[in-house]
Amino acid sequence: MYTKDTIVAIATPQGNGGIGIIRISGIDALAIAEKLTKKQLKPRYATFCNVYNDNEIIDHGIVIFFKAPLSYTGEDVVEIQAHGNPFILNLIIKAALNCGARMAKAGEFTERAFLNNKLDLTQAEAVADIINASSEIAAKSAAKSLQGDFSKEINNLLEKLIYLRMYVEASIDFPEEEINFLEDQKIHSSLEEIYKVILAVKNSCKQGVILAEGITLILVGKPNAGKSSLLNALAGKESAIVTSIAGTTRDIVKEHIQINGVPMHIIDTAGLRNSDDIIESEGIKRAIKKIQEADQVLFVTDDYTNSQVKFSDIKEIIPEFYDQIPKDIDITYVHNKIDLLKEVPHNHANHIYISAENNIGIDKLKEHILNKVGYTNQNESIYTARERHVTAINNAFEHIKLAKEQLELGNGELLAEELLIVQEYLNSITGEFSSDDLLGEIFSSFCIGK
């Protein structure tokens, strides 16, 4: 069991509220709580009492003691439910510190839960995901990860992989046997099954990352092309000022929306043009910088000639900025103001036709965005995932392909080695083998009281 010092923190969000919760965890949690309350606390009982600093009453509320290991962290845990005034809560924190506790670091309660085997690393990450979920589907998916769906899939895969690796190694360890184990159809079928499962998990992880982290869309284009109108149309509200004056948007405007439950972070940028205006020029610099961070760029244009669509690329429309835009970035050309055309072309490839002002073609654009980012699975059975999960699964997938090659070549030792590498990558997902640096990075992203 993880039994270092005793930690304390406010577990509820900052600000005023009806109730504020303070969490204490560690070997001295009960002793500290009994000093604060001057009560003997029974495990799993709600005790209504005063909370003191020495002999001065700070507040009164409900105190619950969770005896190890039947607690969130696996240690002795006490939760004090007081009035949700920040000044009151901070006074209780100070009193707990005076009794020997220390302030918890970000995510330290969940880190202790992980180190005490109350949950694995994917479940620990799901705690943060469920707190930060920005859509209903994302919240449900995070809940599935928290209850262990993702972990079970990885562990079932590991079980099959380890069994196969042991079988292969047995063929290496007993060369005197006249049977060629590598020609055994059992190995071929088992390896093929593992390959297919890893491929399926790889695809699920990609969907899970989209739900957990969302998609960043950047709206760029020349001034007055309708970027702000498009932002408002996608958001379904007036998020940006729209005028006929070119250069109205001079800074970054952000909006968070959902498209079919997928979180989208939309950023409207200053129109790209050479400008003598200092503020507008700074906005254009920021726009170029944001383009480099985008998952997808929506290049908004109203470039028509004689009421006909002109198929120009970025190099033609804004040649002065072309060299500053990454060449590998995914760009969709959004042809706005189609209400001005006599005949509207059909959407094709990366060209979508809309009228932001009249809300024409917006649903088709949303559908196009989801397809471009690769979100196809809207099944509620999907779980959330992180970029590190995707990296680990991608690496495992590459090495399982190498394992298949070694099997075809009859190289038993190299086959076993590739299977071991796959196993290590899968273990890193659930935290079976994780470096201190990785753990520090993961838990530091949590809020203090979790």
Curated annotation (Swiss-Prot):
<comment type="similarity">
    <text>Belongs to the TRAFAC class TrmE-Era-EngA-EngB-Septin-like GTPase superfamily. TrmE GTPase family.</text>
</comment>
<feature type="binding site">
    <location>
        <position position="243"/>
    </location>
    <ligand>
        <name>K(+)</name>
    </ligand>
</feature>
<keyword id="KW-0630">Potassium</keyword>
<dbReference type="InterPro" id="IPR018948">
    <property type="entry name" value="GTP-bd_TrmE_N"/>
</dbReference>
<feature type="binding site">
    <location>
        <begin position="224"/>
        <end position="229"/>
    </location>
    <ligand>
        <name>GTP</name>
    </ligand>
</feature>
<feature type="binding site">
    <location>
        <position position="224"/>
    </location>
    <ligand>
        <name>K(+)</name>
    </ligand>
</feature>
<dbReference type="InterPro" id="IPR005225">
    <property type="entry name" value="Small_GTP-bd"/>
</dbReference>
<dbReference type="GO" id="GO:0005525">
    <property type="term" value="F:GTP binding"/>
</dbReference>
<dbReference type="InterPro" id="IPR027368">
    <property type="entry name" value="MnmE_dom2"/>
</dbReference>
<dbReference type="Pfam" id="PF12631">
    <property type="entry name" value="MnmE_helical"/>
</dbReference>
<feature type="binding site">
    <location>
        <position position="450"/>
    </location>
    <ligand>
        <name>(6S)-5-formyl-5,6,7,8-tetrahydrofolate</name>
    </ligand>
</feature>
<dbReference type="Pfam" id="PF01926">
    <property type="entry name" value="MMR_HSR1"/>
</dbReference>
<comment type="subunit">
    <text>Homodimer. Heterotetramer of two MnmE and two MnmG subunits.</text>
</comment>
<keyword id="KW-0963">Cytoplasm</keyword>
<dbReference type="Pfam" id="PF10396">
    <property type="entry name" value="TrmE_N"/>
</dbReference>
<feature type="binding site">
    <location>
        <position position="245"/>
    </location>
    <ligand>
        <name>K(+)</name>
    </ligand>
</feature>
<keyword id="KW-0479">Metal-binding</keyword>
<dbReference type="InterPro" id="IPR025867">
    <property type="entry name" value="MnmE_helical"/>
</dbReference>
<feature type="binding site">
    <location>
        <begin position="243"/>
        <end position="249"/>
    </location>
    <ligand>
        <name>GTP</name>
    </ligand>
</feature>
<dbReference type="GO" id="GO:0002098">
    <property type="term" value="P:tRNA wobble uridine modification"/>
</dbReference>
<dbReference type="GO" id="GO:0030488">
    <property type="term" value="P:tRNA methylation"/>
</dbReference>
<feature type="binding site">
    <location>
        <position position="79"/>
    </location>
    <ligand>
        <name>(6S)-5-formyl-5,6,7,8-tetrahydrofolate</name>
    </ligand>
</feature>
<comment type="function">
    <text>Exhibits a very high intrinsic GTPase hydrolysis rate. Involved in the addition of a carboxymethylaminomethyl (cmnm) group at the wobble position (U34) of certain tRNAs, forming tRNA-cmnm(5)s(2)U34.</text>
</comment>
<dbReference type="InterPro" id="IPR027417">
    <property type="entry name" value="P-loop_NTPase"/>
</dbReference>
<feature type="binding site">
    <location>
        <position position="23"/>
    </location>
    <ligand>
        <name>(6S)-5-formyl-5,6,7,8-tetrahydrofolate</name>
    </ligand>
</feature>
<feature type="binding site">
    <location>
        <position position="249"/>
    </location>
    <ligand>
        <name>Mg(2+)</name>
    </ligand>
</feature>
<feature type="binding site">
    <location>
        <position position="248"/>
    </location>
    <ligand>
        <name>K(+)</name>
    </ligand>
</feature>
<dbReference type="GO" id="GO:0003924">
    <property type="term" value="F:GTPase activity"/>
</dbReference>
<dbReference type="InterPro" id="IPR006073">
    <property type="entry name" value="GTP-bd"/>
</dbReference>
<dbReference type="InterPro" id="IPR027266">
    <property type="entry name" value="TrmE/GcvT_dom1"/>
</dbReference>
<dbReference type="GO" id="GO:0046872">
    <property type="term" value="F:metal ion binding"/>
</dbReference>
<keyword id="KW-0342">GTP-binding</keyword>
<keyword id="KW-0378">Hydrolase</keyword>
<keyword id="KW-0460">Magnesium</keyword>
<keyword id="KW-0547">Nucleotide-binding</keyword>
<dbReference type="InterPro" id="IPR004520">
    <property type="entry name" value="GTPase_MnmE"/>
</dbReference>
<feature type="binding site">
    <location>
        <begin position="268"/>
        <end position="271"/>
    </location>
    <ligand>
        <name>GTP</name>
    </ligand>
</feature>
<protein>
    <recommendedName>
        <fullName>tRNA modification GTPase MnmE</fullName>
        <ecNumber>3.6.-.-</ecNumber>
    </recommendedName>
</protein>
<dbReference type="InterPro" id="IPR031168">
    <property type="entry name" value="G_TrmE"/>
</dbReference>
<keyword id="KW-0819">tRNA processing</keyword>
<feature type="domain" description="TrmE-type G">
    <location>
        <begin position="214"/>
        <end position="374"/>
    </location>
</feature>
<feature type="binding site">
    <location>
        <position position="228"/>
    </location>
    <ligand>
        <name>Mg(2+)</name>
    </ligand>
</feature>
